[in-house]
Amino acid sequence: MASESGKLWGGRFVGAVDPIMEKFNASIAYDRHLWEVDVQGSKAYSRGLEKAGLLTKAEMDQILHGLDKVAEEWAQGTFKLNSNDEDIHTANERRLKELIGATAGKLHTGRSRNDQVVTDLRLWMRQTCSTLSGLLWELIRTMVDRAEAERDVLFPGYTHLQRAQPIRWSHWILSHAVALTRDSERLLEVRKRINVLPLGSGAIAGNPLGVDRELLRAELNFGAITLNSMDATSERDFVAEFLFWASLCMTHLSRMAEDLILYCTKEFSFVQLSDAYSTGSSLMPQKKNPDSLELIRSKAGRVFGRCAGLLMTLKGLPSTYNKDLQEDKEAVFEVSDTMSAVLQVATGVISTLQIHQENMGQALSPDMLATDLAYYLVRKGMPFRQAHEASGKAVFMAETKGVALNQLSLQELQTISPLFSGDVICVWDYGHSVEQYGALGGTARSSVDWQIRQVRALLQAQQA
């Protein structure tokens, strides 16, 4: 129970804490986000104390009623913090004492803030993972729906930012959607490891008062119970794993944003962002800036920084709880907010994006079919390495003559290889080009349709 100073640990101390240290030590400015889960954990723990014979039924009911009142004040915005509330646990317990009196002092029996805070954090992150999963699934669904609707749109595929081969626009969309399905799968795995109960571990050695941890697990709907009390109160690998998940997901989203930023420039003019996800210039009236995509790209760095920062905090800690672990919550809250905003904006961008199909088609050029020319010779029986060389010679001949690759005459092609014949004309058809990539995972329509079915099946399985 809080001492006269309002501290949960004040009995050992005589002098007052330096005001600068008081401010430096406090975490209430951000861990107030945990108010709801802190109340949930305390309600479950009071039931555990009652079962262990450490609270009477009347005392438990009094505490539960008081905690309901605390939660009501938080929900209605009427909860008043005071200067001694260094963290959410202190604030809630102080208010509980004001509401129900000395009985509130029994709630912390056998419980440490070490196991209390990590329980709160796991509860909060478990819900956050579920929320972010829903947002990520919605983005992937939006991308797949778009890919299905625009399957017949062709445009240049790029490697090294150089035009490479004709592909379906849908194939590009699905390349990013598939990456995001791995992110959604990873997030489910992270949630599974978060969903483990540490409450009942005490500060380091465990709980000596017969509290039933299985009851606590059931009350808070955790999937399992931590195996070791020292590990339970000090380990933050689940936080690091969440931050790494966010970093990897942001890597994928940043790459997609970078592509779209390029595609919406005048130089490409393949797509146009909706006004709802663009801004203008304060000086240049003609400008339409892709700020939504640029912010997605830039916020990846913010998330990476939080992940690296936490790992640097964790790597030098001795065993069990240290105050350094207070740094975990700001990282989690900020990254969670960032991911929520980014996923919603990305979904809005994709759902409202306008494509310029004519410009995409005009960007296709015969030189992008040089690989197809090599495949043509392979189908005639030429080894691929020779076919690659022959196609390269055709490209050089066309460049030397200042003509497009498909403008070389049959006679000119036959000077390179006698295997060229009149049916080489089929090579110069972009639709024919993409359709030859019918192997699973390719850009042919049958393969794109298969990819769409597979991604939808993955989403359905993940949501089951």
Curated annotation (Swiss-Prot):
Changing residue 288 to R: Refractory to inhibition by TSA and NAM and by addition of extra amino acids. No effect on protein structure. The modification N-acetylalanine is found at residue 2. Pathway: Amino-acid biosynthesis; L-arginine biosynthesis; L-arginine from L-ornithine and carbamoyl phosphate: step 3/3; Nitrogen metabolism; urea cycle; L-arginine and fumarate from (N(omega)-L-arginino)succinate: step 1/1. Its EC number is 4.3.2.1. InterPro entries: Arg_succ_lyase_C, Argininosuccinate_lyase, Fumarase/histidase_N, Fumarate_lyase_CS, Fumarate_lyase_fam, Fumarate_lyase_N, L-Aspartase-like. HAMAP family: Arg_succ_lyase. This is Argininosuccinate lyase. The lineage of its organism: Eukaryota, Metazoa, Chordata, Craniata, Vertebrata.
